[in-house]
Amino acid sequence: MSQQHTLPVTLPPTLSQELLKNVSPPADIQQEQRKQPTPLPAPCQKVLSELPVAVPSKHEEKHATPVKGLLEQECGQLQQQEPQEQEVHLAKHQELQELQEQELHLGKQPEPQEQELHLGKQQQQQESQEQELYLGKQPEPQDQELHLGKQQAPQEQELHLGKQPEPQEQELHLGKQPEPQDQELYLGKRLEPQEQELHLGKQQQQQESQEQELDLGKQPEPQDQELHLGKQQAPQEQELHLGKQPEPQEQELHLVKQQEPQDQELHLGKRLEPQEQELHLGKQQQPQEQKLHPGEAAAAGVTGAGPAASKAARRATGAGTAPGKAAAAAGATGAGTAATAPATAEERQKAESLEQQLEQEKAQREEQLKEQLEEKKRILDQQLDQEVAKRYEQLGVKKEQLLQPLGQQEGQLEKPVFVPAPGQVQDIQPPQPPKGEVLLPAEQQQEPEV
């Protein structure tokens, strides 16, 4: 209607006052409306601006009545819709703020049960790390970071994407925490304290057994030591039985000789057995030689015995110095020396003969080895010569095969081929007979054909 009629329309003062009055909003919106006054809707402003202020006439009032009714209806509808929309918008905004505050409050302050579970996890992780460090195993930090990253991932995704879950979903998300049994299974099936103690006990036992084996490997067993001492004491007892008593000076020299090889063996960290020591010295003395030479026999037999052997020797010498045994020894010395003199000469001869035999055997072996090496060298030289000759023959054959086609090509190149020019006449030469034949004239050659 307003578009069809171009006549000026004026509103009465009562209607203009009602339009200018502010609609009373709720208490929450009043503060915002005080700061920002609510403007009138756009169609109402346009109508007011377009309407001129003039004194209406009777004819104009008749035509303006339908237009006034339409404008009043439109402005009333707009004014009713605006506060409703504002209220709905504010209610939604308040709900969103409340949800955000609840989420932040729940995210910052977990319940006491959740805190206790979180502390329990940390304590278990610390205990497991300490146990692994004690056992020589260090957990990788990447696994821990991944485990923590998996827990933080959903919360960070929700905050980053702006997704705000409802309070019920948050409570369910926070309330879902694994029980201690599930935690133990997730952390790699941690051993119970009893099993851990057993595992540590086994490791300690293994270490102790290894240390004992090392100690035993360096030091001979007590049984071996006793046998070794028994072997050393036997010649001394034989000497006492024969009545020979070494002088104190010889004993001191004997002890000095014993201590020197012991120091050397300790410095090297290896103790040779009595047989190895005898081989190292290059002398193997029989028990009869030990009877005749008590000082040398004791030095050769007791080199690896240590302080225990020296103590036994001292005891034996102390026992031999008793007054009752001294007389018996003095009486038996004459008979013993006379009987052992020929035995020593025979033994020396045997030892010398053995040494000579060993030297001869060594020389024979060396000669045999030299002969074998020379024969092998000869055989290898012959084989090399044969191979070289074969290769030379093969090369000669190949050269001949290659040179034959080259000779044929050279012969063909030596015979020139003359091509006559277009203005020249080629001289036809008769064929020359081979050596020893004479050519007849052409007439005589044609006669036999006729």
Swiss-Prot record:
It comes from the Eukaryota. Residues 120-135, 295-344 have a biased composition (Low complexity). One of its GO terms (biological process) is keratinization. Keywords: Cytoplasm, Keratinization, Repeat. The keyword Repeat applies. Its main location: cytoplasm. It is found in: Cytoplasm. The keyword Cytoplasm applies. Residues 86-108, 187-200, 264-281, 345-370 have a biased composition (Basic and acidic residues). Substrate of transglutaminase. Specific glutamines or lysines are cross-linked to keratins, desmoplakin and to inter involucrin molecules. One of its GO terms (cellular component) is cornified envelope. Keratinocytes of epidermis and other stratified squamous epithelia. Residues 1-19 have a biased composition (Polar residues). Residues 1-43, 77-370, 422-450 are annotated as: Disordered. Belongs to the involucrin family. Part of the insoluble cornified cell envelope (CE) of stratified squamous epithelia. Directly or indirectly cross-linked to cornifelin (CNFN). This is Involucrin. The gene is IVL.
